[in-house]
Amino acid sequence: MGRILAELPAEPSSTDALMLPQSTNVVVDPSADDLTAAAKEFLSTFTKPDLNSLGQNFRVYDEEHERSAGVQELYRINHINQTYVFGQQIRKKHLQFNKAVMGIWESCELLNEFVDESDPDLDEPQIEHLLQTAEAIRRAHPDQDWFHLTGLIHDLGKVLLHPKFGSEPQWAVVGDTYPLGCAFDESIVHHEFFADNVDSKDARFTSQNGIYEEGCGLEKVAMSWGHDEFLYQVLQHNKTTLPPQALFVIRYHSFYALHHSGAYTHLMNDFDREMLPWLHEFNKYDLYSKSKVRVDVEKVKPYYMTLIEKYFPNELQW
């Protein structure tokens, strides 16, 4: 059973260094021949739906629908407050890994209490989406068990919304992510709200490269704070044995300006380019599994528990 660490030490003066995965696993192209048969079998039972679970097109942010006002307001607050300085401060706050000790499945269950207010496609508790994504990947890539598990856990950083973690506001946890310390690309959802972000008026941060060097690699780029980065750092701290492909997907799955619009590629290095096909592959199941198809939790739980035991310690420091 997880437990909360009652007394927190003082915050350190600087954040922990961002670490690349140390594994040297060979990267496999998800379009390789050995996956083709499995993908074809999957496509007979899962095809990209035309509409999301609310009956609208996917990722539509500029039309009126039942959740549009709330989504727009979240991005307005997000884009005003996600500054380079804020990003550094909140990393110091949350990368001490002293908020809780609990296992992976317990953290999945915590998300039952939340709906992502930034998501125009989904109005269900998060655990439904996690299992939909994991099962969709499992059918398409039956031999890649790490990929199934990645689908299950990819949003677990949203536990930051829970009182155990200080009830962070949704704008600091969910939504699309983007680099801080350089110009905000126009492809970012609701780009217009960056006009009120102080970094938009700071000459250090307004050029294409900003404080970075071209080709420096995404691991050297400070991203807007959210559940992606938090979970990535938790997994690194707890020495997961998931391959680097999984960690890259977890860290950048909300970076739509990159994997959907092709922005910020000038900051990528060779490692990032090798990982990117897996991010594209994952997004198909992350986005288009948001439907009314329900997953029998008790039926699939034993399978995922075996994967959790394979790749994680019994309890993790969060």
What are these regions (language model features)?
Residues 299-318:
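C-terminal helix/juxtamembrane-tail motif
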Residues 122-298:
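Divalent metal-dependent catalytic cores for phosphoryl transfer on phosphate-bearing substrates
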Residues 1-106, 113, 318:
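Non-catalytic interface/linker regions that flank or bridge core catalytic/transmembrane domains
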Residues 91-128, 211-218:
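Active-site flanking loop/helix segments enriched in acidic
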Residues 7, 11, 45, 114-117, ...:
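Surface-exposed polar/charged interaction patches
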Residues 2, 12, 51, 66, ...:
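Compositionally biased, low-complexity repeat tracts
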